[in-house]
Amino acid sequence: MKYAILLLFFAASVAFAATPTFPLVEVPSAHGTSDTLVVFISGDGGWAAIDREISNVLASDGMPVVGLNALQYFWKKRTPEAASGDLATIIDRYLGGWHKSRVLLVGYSRGADVLPAMVSRLPADAQAKVRMLVLLSPSQKVEFEFHVADWMHNSSAGMPVKPEVDKLGSQRILCLSGQDDHDSLCGELTGRPNVEIVTLKGAHHFDGGYGKLGQIIIEHLK
């Protein structure tokens, strides 16, 4: 019996050690009324004001948020396949841990750029749980690695994002951009029945007013 207990303890320890760790931020909800988990991938500024304020609005509406700090995560080069696998792990872990059945995926800037490729590579059972993708200020191209120079200017390198959106079929998408953000992907997605496009004042950072973005997401989710 003693050896059986030791064996179980050892197995649990190995499983815990093998559990991947990610730069995550948890924003629990005080109201457990929603069946939806939010996974939010930030931009290159890390977990910044826009991510915090939108997450607080979503959590106050009953949807707990787990945020992936893209600055830290993409400091190391990733592949779309590996990033998708990590997203699947996060979704599975938090759906079970927070007792939710569906997921809302939100990305800002680089977070929005990587989401289509990550979602298109998810297992079918995980894709079936996705209520909607929210792309905030998505660009035309994306690299799955952060470079310090990206803080200075937009890079024209990387894989095109639009073909990855095409792979998502009828998946519901909400695309938000500033009217002065001329590099935004949103304009390339007009006319698609599964894509809702919202254009707001400002440019890539929407000129602040981040709480309003959270409310727009909630309105379109209904």
Which residues make up each language-model segment?
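Short, surface-exposed "cap/lid" segments of acyl-processing enzymes
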Residues: 30-63, 69-70
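The feature captures the conserved acid-bearing segment of alpha/beta-hydrolase catalytic domains
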Residues: 28, 143-193
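Active-site nucleophile loop of the alpha/beta-hydrolase fold
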Residues: 132-144
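Conserved hydrolase catalytic core segment
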Residues: 118-130
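A short loop-to-beta-strand scaffold at the N-terminal edge of the catalytic core in hydrolase folds
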Residues: 19-28, 36-37
